[in-house]
């Protein structure tokens, strides 16, 4: 049986019904080499603070539900292990989002941004009786990396521009738009570029690159945004040269 140790975890809590501002609470949690932060939060809720609020679902870094700040770095709780934080751990709600309660944030703008870029195949008239819509490996390679997003919101918590401008559609939405724009089956690029070319689109990004650094799926949203800027520049150049 693995040897159990104890770790003091600072959880920044907030209940809008009784608190005027977030405050810290400290909990002593037993752990071994396999204990994740999500396990620790479950222990706290079951044994120490039944009213602690946080999101979780799959426990396997697939659903993206358990994003939070760990020592000021956006992380998934299920992929964060206490063994790596023997000097202490501070857990907070994701940065740059309004806090609903404790570690739960309001993702409304995030979801609306994803919806706004129309994340689905547009203008493909192929029917089921025509068979599968086959792509070559090269065609799939253009967008495959950008299709791995799990909508966890870590890139928004990492993005300094989203922190300054909450209307910025953000890394995940731009990446998703680029994913579909690069899909050979899709014909909706013109519709999405209206969003990417807008004031709160790709040009709000100053290319810090922290969004790619914290991405748990190595999607590289920073690269997608820069490629989006290239496409936006093409649109601008064509519009400039087109006869009026």
From Swiss-Prot:
It is an enzyme of class 1 (oxidoreductase). GO terms for biological process: anaerobic electron transport chain; anaerobic respiration; bacterial-type flagellum assembly; fermentation; tricarboxylic acid cycle. [3Fe-4S] cluster binds at residues 159, 205, 211. Gene3D superfamilies: 3.10.20.30, Alpha-helical ferredoxin (1.10.1060.10). [2Fe-2S] cluster binds at residues 58, 63, 66, 78. [4Fe-4S] cluster binds at residues 149, 152, 155, 215. Changing residue 66 to S: Affects center 1 (2Fe-2S). Its cofactor is [2Fe-2S] cluster; [3Fe-4S] cluster; [4Fe-4S] cluster. Residues 140-169 form the 4Fe-4S ferredoxin-type domain. One of its GO terms (molecular function) is 3 iron, 4 sulfur cluster binding. It is a peripheral membrane protein. GO terms for cellular component: cytosol; fumarate reductase complex; membrane; plasma membrane. A menaquinone binds at residues 14, 226-229. Residues 16-97 form the 2Fe-2S ferredoxin-type domain. Its EC number is 1.3.5.1. It is found in: Cell inner membrane. Disulfide bonds: none annotated. Two distinct, membrane-bound, FAD-containing enzymes are responsible for the catalysis of fumarate and succinate interconversion; fumarate reductase is used during anaerobic growth, and succinate dehydrogenase is used during aerobic growth. The QFR enzyme complex binds 2 quinones in or near the membrane; 1 near the [3Fe-4S] cluster (QP is proximal to the [3Fe-4S] cluster, on the cytoplasmic side of the membrane) while QD (the distal cluster) is on the other side of the membrane. It is not clear if both of the quinol-binding sites are functionally relevant. Belongs to the succinate dehydrogenase/fumarate reductase iron-sulfur protein family. Part of an enzyme complex containing four subunits: a flavoprotein (FrdA), an iron-sulfur protein (FrdB), and two hydrophobic anchor proteins (FrdC and FrdD). This is Fumarate reductase iron-sulfur subunit. It comes from Escherichia coli (strain K12). The lineage of its organism: Bacteria, Pseudomonadati, Pseudomonadota, Gammaproteobacteria, Enterobacterales. The gene is frdB.
């Amino acid at each position: 049986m693995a040897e159990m140790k104890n770790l003091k975890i600072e959880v920044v809590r907030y209940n809008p019904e009784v608190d005027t501002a977030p405050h810290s609470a400290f909990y002593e949690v037993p752990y071994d080499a396999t204990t994740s932060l999500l396990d620790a939060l479950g222990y706290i809720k079951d044994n120490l603070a039944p009213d602690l609020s946080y999101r979780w679902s799959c426990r396997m870094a697939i659903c993206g539900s358990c994003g939070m700040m760990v020592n000021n770095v956006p992380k998934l709780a299920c992929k964060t292990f206490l063994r790596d934080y023997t000097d202490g751990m501070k857990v907070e709600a994701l940065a740059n989002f309004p806090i609903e309660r404790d570690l739960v944030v309001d993702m409304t703008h995030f979801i609306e941004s994803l919806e706004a870029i129309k994340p689905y195949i547009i203008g493909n008239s192929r029917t089921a009786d025509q068979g599968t819509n086959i792509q070559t490996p090269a065609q799939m390679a253009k967008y495959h990396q950008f299709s791995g997003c799990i909508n966890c919101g870590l890139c928004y918590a990492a993005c300094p521009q989203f922190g300054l401008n909450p209307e910025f559609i953000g890394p995940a939405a731009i990446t998703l738009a680029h994913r579909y724009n690069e899909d050979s089956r899709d014909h909706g690029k013109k519709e999405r570029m209206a969003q990417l070319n807008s004031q709160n689109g790709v040009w709000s990004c100053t290319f810090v690159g922290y969004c790619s650094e914290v991405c748990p799926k190595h999607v590289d949203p920073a690269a997608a945004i820069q490629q989006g800027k290239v496409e936006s520049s093409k649109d601008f150049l064509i519009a400039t040269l087109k006869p009026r």
